[in-house]
Amino acid sequence: MNWQYIHSVLPQFFSATLTTLKISIISIILAILVGLICSILITYRVRVLNRIAQFYIELSRNTPLLIQLFFLYYGLPKLGIKIDGFACGVIGLTFLGGSYMAEAFRAGLKSVAQGQIDSAKSIGLQPTQIFRYVIFPQALAISIPAIGANCLFLIKESSVVSA
């Protein structure tokens, strides 16, 4: 084993690790936001936006990440949109992760018992208050295991970004 070679490339490994962590953390934060918005649009059936969110989730979950990244990196410049590699990786992982997060949040929102919502209505809470104080805290607690699994999934998928 050539220890001098390992010692010479070690800084590159640390640099690559930091880049991977940056891409993963930014993508996870953005994916959680995208997922939450999409799950609310789907769960509460906001007219046209509901269909757009469903289309986005189906498209993202049913195409491989590598194909999505190829489209972003090679396809968008053909349309006149220039994106650097880092931004392409973040957008691609966010696009993929947002759909999985949306399904995790949707499951959490659907699992809140109707009796909880009826009780909140009976004490005079407004719909936004019901969502903020009754539905969202319970849905978030239920969704945390799936969100954690999706975060790990995105960290693992960040290896594809290097391709």
Model regions and ranges:
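Transmembrane alpha-helices and adjacent helix-loop boundaries
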Residues: 1-163
